[in-house]
């Protein structure tokens, strides 16, 4: 999307010598996991940059899924529907975010292999929290602090279970499970 408010033109801002979107496109191409690397955008300049780095941009994203409130799911569904209407059979879909410059091809390949081996319906990238969340602190309305899990006040960090959060690099799914994305997040 070309209309980011927080960081204008973020998808094509230069990061370490090239547009930030280039890193995701190059990683996708180098992973050898995809028959096609497609960029969905509403912006002509982003489209040109994406093509320059080897992606296809076969359509312009409709305005109704190109605003500040557009979620990822309808964007992916639109791309899949468009591809299928062109006669393509889509079994698996990966949404690699344009602003994921640190994603590497091996991470994509390994995730895809695990996705297939486990016969999963959905996958996404995760990273561990740098500090045990069991020792997280909350601040109430009067400014007082307390632990979310007071029972871990004296626990050694190395004794606590490692926890993870969405790394924001990619999601992958079987194409007809797109509408269930958020249900999967809630089932973990």
Enumerate the predicted regions with their spans.
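Conserved SAM-binding loop
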Residues: 13-14, 38-39, 95
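Short internal beta-strands
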Residues: 22, 37-41, 125
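N-terminal nucleotide-binding beta1-loop-alpha1 segment
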Residues: 1-8
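Conserved core of the sugar-phosphate nucleotidyltransferase
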Residues: 74, 78, 101-187
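Short, high-confidence coil segments that cap the C-terminus of an alpha-helix
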Residues: 34, 88-90, 119-120
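A short, N-terminal amphipathic alpha-helix
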Residues: 20-36, 48
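Short phosphate-binding loop-to-helix
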Residues: 45-94, 102-106, 110
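Short, structured coil segments at secondary-structure junctions
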Residues: 33, 53-55, 141
